[in-house]
UniProtKB/Swiss-Prot annotation:
Belongs to the 2-oxoacid dehydrogenase family. It comes from Zymomonas mobilis subsp. mobilis (strain ATCC 31821 / ZM4 / CP4). One of its GO terms (molecular function) is dihydrolipoyllysine-residue acetyltransferase activity. Forms a 24-polypeptide structural core with octahedral symmetry. Residues 91-113, 192-214 are annotated as: Disordered. This is Dihydrolipoyllysine-residue acetyltransferase component of pyruvate dehydrogenase complex. Keywords: Acyltransferase, Lipoyl, Transferase. Residues 192-202 have a biased composition (Polar residues). Residues 2-78 form the Lipoyl-binding domain.
Length: 440
């Protein structure tokens, strides 16, 4: 009996992905544990292993295909003793026949069984003057063989929000409607409802601009970054606290540590020490090591620090788990491994999903100070500015010191200003008296 190879769920939250590359071809024999393909999620490219043995009879989804729903059949394998060509032919016919039936069914029921538009949504679109645009969208789809192409996730979201798929312009392959299209349509309608007399072309993702330009399609990662940061700024009331921290003692200790660790080929970075200081400060102020969760607050018993790492096409935050318990040398080695895998796109979901707080360091770019956006569902993030030589008062005397400006962003729903201040004070003390970092 033939074996269906389905799009895997490579993380608990994955609903769709991109089939980045096939590592096998039709006719190849495979065994359990062999890698079939590379799947791109919103944060990484991951290898997909088969759990069955057989021969690849037919590849149904070509590499490079985007927005492939979890559970969709992407290939068919023939078991030992089966006629490979017969399995391939059967797979091909099964693809075309349901498609033809769906076309006929769609044509017969298009007028009588379309998803109704919620009255308020319809009114919002009408008030904002989107009537002509909607008619054009509907006409364009009616001209296309009478069938609307949409992903299963998009269909569920449309049904839940009473959106007529005929009014949505698909941005997926061959005009296929994907989840992002439904979300954009709903956002546009909501914007129209709140500003009925104002034309907002930006809401639809179509900006009119006379300046010569290139249109660059957003990657999966960039779309997720855009969505999550928008959610953060819209839903989380940020409070910002800033401190100036003298770095000289920490820099001196780092130099001494690296001299002694050189024989082990370990080099501790300033960021490694700041991560450890952040973790210890979180343990010292448990009211900050928390997360907002609807009608409850989660208080964490360990400090898992998400570290912002710049990668091609965006940003990812690998996690140093239990950073408060790790030695500086162990923390440094693990961090370098995580950064390397992050830039190769080889992180596993459990290595970047979660965390109790984040840190973002832009000091190496000469940035003096910035406010970082909280990474939900976390409730805090540290923004590290560059260390620079500044006048500094010590014992009523002015001297020159290396000083960095560091800003903490906190979720004011669960973190009070006084608790945030206590955390920043604890962090500052650990950096300026860095032996405390080694002692814990």
């Amino acid at each position: 009996m033939s074996i269906e190879v389905k799009m895997p769920a490579l993380s608990p939250t994955m609903t769709e992905g991109t089939l980045a590359k096939w590592l096998v071809k039709e006719g190849d024999a495979v065994k359990a544990g062999d890698i079939l393909a590379e799947i791109e999620t919103d944060k990484a490219i991951m290898e997909f292993e088969t759990v069955d043995a057989g021969i690849i009879a037919k590849i149904l989804v070509p590499e490079g295909s985007e927005n492939i729903a979890v559970g969709q059949v992407i290939a068919v394998m023939a078991e030992a003793g089966e006629d490979v060509s017969q399995v391939a032919a059967s797979a091909s016919s099964q693809i075309s026949e349901p498609s033809e039936k769906a076309d006929v069914a769609q044509k017969e029921t298009a007028d009588s069984e379309t998803i109704s538009i919620d009255a308020s949504l319809d009114k919002a679109i009408s008030n904002a003057g989107y009537g002509n645009k909607t008619e054009n969208m509907t006409a364009s789809y009616q001209e296309k063989a009478g069938r609307i192409k949409a992903s299963p996730l998009a269909k569920r979201l449309a049904k839940k929000n009473h959106v007529d798929l005929k009014q949505v312009n698909g941005s997926g392959p061959h005009g296929r409607i994907i989840k992002a299209d439904i979300e954009a349509f709903i956002a546009e309608a909501n914007q129209a409802s709140s500003n009925p007399s104002v034309s907002t072309p930006e809401a639809s993702g179509k900006i009119t601009h006379d300046t010569p330009h290139n249109s660059i399609k957003l990657s999966n990662m960039r779309r997720v970054i855009a969505r999550r940061l928008t959610e953060s700024k819209q839903n989380i009331p940020h409070i910002y606290l800033t401190v100036d921290v003298q770095m000289d003692a920490l820099l001196k200790l780092r130099s001494e540590l690296n001299e002694s660790l050189a024989v082990q080929n370990i080099k501790i970075s300033v960021n490694d020490m700041l991560i450890k200081a952040q973790a210890l400060a979180l343990k010292a102020t448990p009211n900050v090591n928390v997360a907002f969760d609807g009608d409850q607050m989660l208080q964490f018993s360990q400090a898992d620090i998400s570290v912002a790492v710049s990668v091609e096409g965006g940003l990812i935050t690998p996690i140093l788990k239990q950073a408060d318990t790790k030695s500086l040398s162990a923390l440094s080695v693990e961090m370098k491994e995580l950064i390397a895998r992050a830039r190769e796109g080889r992180l596993q979901p459990q290595e970047y999903q979660g965390g109790t707080s984040s840190i973002s360091n832009m000091g190496m770019f000469g940035i003096k100070q910035f406010n970082a956006v909280i990474n939900p569902p976390q409730a805090s993030i540290l923004a590290i500015g560059s260390g620079e030589r500044r006048p500094w008062v010590i014992d009523d005397a002015i001297t020159i010191a290396t000083v960095a400006t560091i800003t903490g962003s906190f979720d004011h729903r669960v973190i009070d200003g006084a608790d945030a201040a206590a955390f920043m004070s604890a962090f500052k003390h650990l950096v300026e008296k860095p032996l405390g970092i080694l002692a814990q």
